[in-house]
Amino acid sequence: MNFVVIIPVRFFSTRFPGKALADINGKPMIVRVMENALDSGANKVIIATDSSCIARVIESEQSESEVCLTRSTHQSGTERLAEVAINYKFSDDQIIVHLQGDEPLLSSTMIRQVASILCSMSSTISMATLATPLSSFKEARDDNVVKVVINMNSNALYFSRSMIPWNTGDFVNHLDSKFSKTLLRHIGIYAYRVKFLRRYIAWTKSPLEQIEHLEQLRVLWHGEAIHVSVIDDVFNISVDTPESLSRVNTVFKKNKYATVHN
């Protein structure tokens, strides 16, 4: 299977500036993410950034990854990624995995899995992504945790930072276990083909995308399908705040992931 991983990353994150270079058990976060991508078996790994600081850090690693400096005007990671895919002149059918730079716990297995899912789908599916059952009521109410609702064909109906779906009677203080397969947390990784990216950047930004600050809503707004594969027993923490960074460091210090590259 031929796929390329592109990691769009900027230094001045709105919620947590500088997080890309935040230390995770002795290495910058972006390096941790890059290492997982390199372990996935991707044909190429590219870090797409508008930051010379981030570029220097990646280049100092002397790894097999590449750095592509992009424009600073992009409104989303997908827009930044699309610039790279087009500049590299990848073929229209080339599969691109969008790995977010704040996902240091996303394993190489999951990276390869999302590429494999899209590879097996018909061309009517524009994107593939992953989700896992919500683990707690606290997680469900956390607006840093993105939720997704899917239909009977496992295609996304909607993504939100709010709790969806919501039951005013059953979800007051806990999650009803009978809905465990319906209450899903989105995992921030995508796969798409280059020809889809060309369409994406031509679309206007959708109102839903602007309200939720979720770039994948542009795809649903414009009527295209996102396939969601649900996987169980996924432990993942996105680094959105200093608090979540601390939790990720705790994980690495317990050697759940850190031993891979030491």
Curated annotation (Swiss-Prot):
<comment type="pathway">
    <text>Nucleotide-sugar biosynthesis; CMP-3-deoxy-D-manno-octulosonate biosynthesis; CMP-3-deoxy-D-manno-octulosonate from 3-deoxy-D-manno-octulosonate and CTP: step 1/1.</text>
</comment>
<dbReference type="GO" id="GO:0033468">
    <property type="term" value="P:CMP-keto-3-deoxy-D-manno-octulosonic acid biosynthetic process"/>
</dbReference>
<dbReference type="GO" id="GO:0009103">
    <property type="term" value="P:lipopolysaccharide biosynthetic process"/>
</dbReference>
<dbReference type="GO" id="GO:0008690">
    <property type="term" value="F:3-deoxy-manno-octulosonate cytidylyltransferase activity"/>
</dbReference>
<dbReference type="Pfam" id="PF02348">
    <property type="entry name" value="CTP_transf_3"/>
</dbReference>
<comment type="similarity">
    <text>Belongs to the KdsB family.</text>
</comment>
<dbReference type="InterPro" id="IPR004528">
    <property type="entry name" value="KdsB"/>
</dbReference>
<keyword id="KW-0808">Transferase</keyword>
<keyword id="KW-0963">Cytoplasm</keyword>
<dbReference type="GO" id="GO:0005829">
    <property type="term" value="C:cytosol"/>
</dbReference>
<keyword id="KW-0448">Lipopolysaccharide biosynthesis</keyword>
<keyword id="KW-0548">Nucleotidyltransferase</keyword>
<dbReference type="InterPro" id="IPR003329">
    <property type="entry name" value="Cytidylyl_trans"/>
</dbReference>
<protein>
    <recommendedName>
        <fullName>3-deoxy-manno-octulosonate cytidylyltransferase</fullName>
        <ecNumber>2.7.7.38</ecNumber>
    </recommendedName>
</protein>
<dbReference type="InterPro" id="IPR029044">
    <property type="entry name" value="Nucleotide-diphossugar_trans"/>
</dbReference>
<comment type="pathway">
    <text>Bacterial outer membrane biogenesis; lipopolysaccharide biosynthesis.</text>
</comment>
<comment type="function">
    <text>Activates KDO (a required 8-carbon sugar) for incorporation into bacterial lipopolysaccharide in Gram-negative bacteria.</text>
</comment>
